[in-house]
Amino acid sequence: MLRRARPTTFAIFLVAALATASVCLGAEPKAKKLKPVPLPLLPATQEWIATLDDAPSAGGAMDAERVYVPLQSERIVALRRADGSRVWTRDIESKWPPVVIGDAVYIVASDEMHALDAATGTERWRVPFEHQLTAPLAATTSLATGGTERSLVAVADKGLVIAVAAADGRTIWMRELGALSRFTPALDDVRTFVALDDGRMVALRLMDGRVEWDQKLEGKLNQPSVSRDRVFVGTNTNLLYAFDNSSGRLAWRWKAGGDVIGTSADAKGGAYYASLDNVLRAVNRGNGNQRWIKEIPTRPLLAPLTLGDGVKYEEIVVLTGATSEIDAFAAKNGASVGMYQPPPGGDLEGPPLIDGDLKPYQVAMVVITRDGRVIGLKPSAMLLPEPALLPLPPELPGRRLERERVTPPATR
């Protein structure tokens, strides 16, 4: 007697048969999506080293083609980024790092400001600048909201903040704040944020220099930074403050174990700050909740730098130490992902110059040493290793063949 199959059992067999048939008909399983790896900036391999005619007078600047370095012999030199060869030299003295905007290089001398063509070094404009800078120049990365031109922002003696038009050197506005600043201003598309020696954090509108907010904090302030809707500044009282960038409202603050020397942030809501207790911390940008904490191998010298887009590569945090060691950490969990130590005697002059858009076989990082060396570095992971040259064996494998002797035909 035949038994009737249950509908559930029949459905199971039908699904299995269809799945088998689809495989037989050539259907391919879905490929697994590869997870991005941390940006492979470090470790790095030295591509070239150039010896300057004199020691550098300040840190340098870099664009896609060249590296620009001011010298103590009152000159500025441009080197080719690919191989370190000299491109041009100009007789301009400066004790401040140059700034690059597009195809122009900007230098502040003792009493003038210069704009040079980046490719040739020829002068584009030159204007008197009677103020003494107290910190390196800052440059807008785009047109300010409501503005019509790119600008440079300088902090000078007497507590002056000055905005200069990048196109022609014209002074757009000046604002006196009543106290010196010793740190490069932080900029977004609307405002510039200045940390003052009297403990104030001030936001000025980029378009006209109007004061938008002013916050008084405890202790001496360090290098400010901005990311989306947050402005960060650390102090020598071991505190990190985060403010709303538009209103100046205190969003949160964190207590560290040492002076907080600087902060950077990524595109996914993370913020990273280093303190003089030899610790790097990651927190949520919005509310300050801690994500991870990492002891670092050397005392931090400069503010951290975050690189990576979070899509092609995961973000990394790059930190330069007092021993000139450069370390990279995964922004996701703080794991160490690489380091670079300059050659002996190679104390760094200024921060490393880094291009986060890595390309195979191309120099991505340049360091300048105080003894007058410039070193171009390629990420080791972006190089295909060449096969090692091996000596030929005395006997080749296989059976030796006897030479065939050909007897010429007899001639008549």
Predicted segment positions?
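Bacterial N-terminal signal peptides
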Residues: A11-S22
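Short loop/turn segments that connect beta-strands within beta-propeller blades
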Residues: R80-D83, D117-T120, A165-D168, R205-D208, ...
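A short helix->beta-strand "capping" segment at the edge of beta-propeller domains
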Residues: A31-D54
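Boundary at the C-terminal end of the N-terminal hydrophobic targeting segment
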Residues: C24-P29
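Short loop/turn segments immediately following beta-strands, especially the blade-tip
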Residues: K378-L389
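A short beta-strand motif characteristic of beta-propeller blades
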Residues: T45-A50, S85-R90, T122-V127, R170-R175, ...
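Repeat-blade elements of multi-bladed beta-propeller folds
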Residues: D53-R75, R90-H114, V127-I162, R175-V202, ...
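Bacterial N-terminal signal peptides that target proteins for export
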Residues: M1-F13
